[in-house]
């Protein structure tokens, strides 16, 4: 009698471990800030007006949007799951459930090079989620932003009933 071979389905969380660390680095430039302002509609002088910042700010230069830094946090969270999402036989897939305790600690100036660090802190298989500490540092090693990222491992997406 022929035996039917079946691959056991695994959770993506089986490949996520506390302490795993991922990086994303980028120099924040004019194009990043201008495109982000256009996409979001946030045309604050602090982001787009050189003269205003020279005259009114002790920084003397424009700064990146804080929400742009959250976008870079999202990039590094995507990098963190790249080794998992295309494995065969997964019973679930990752969905960002959000960021807690987001803090902008220092300004990011145009021309700064930031590195987003993503370190898995909690793997909770019972609740189907992982939590990572995210820290963004500039080229001088100064922490400019922090957050906790929650990644939910969903069996299936569904729309909320109305």
How should each PLM-predicted stretch be described?
Residues 2-21, 104-162:
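HotDog/MaoC-like acyl-thioester-processing domains
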């Amino acid at each position: 009698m022929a035996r039917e071979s079946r691959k056991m389905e695994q959770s993506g969380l089986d490949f996520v471990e506390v302490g795993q660390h991922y990086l994303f680095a980028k120099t924040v430039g004019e194009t990043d800030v201008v495109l982000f302002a256009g996409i979001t509609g946030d045309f604050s002088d602090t982001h787009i007006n050189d003269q205003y910042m020279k005259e009114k700010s002790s920084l003397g230069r424009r700064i990146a949007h804080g929400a742009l830094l959250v976008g870079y946090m999202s990039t590094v969270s995507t990098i963190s799951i790249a080794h998992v999402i295309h494995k065969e036989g997964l019973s679930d897939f990752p969905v960002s459930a959000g960021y807690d305790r987001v803090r902008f600690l220092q300004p990011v100036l145009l021309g700064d090079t930031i590195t987003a660090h993503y370190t898995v802190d909690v793997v909770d298989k019972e609740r189907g989620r992982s939590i990572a500490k995210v820290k963004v540092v500039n080229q001088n090693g100064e922490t400019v932003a922090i957050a906790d990222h929650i990644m939910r491992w969903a069996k299936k997406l569904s729309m909320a009933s109305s």
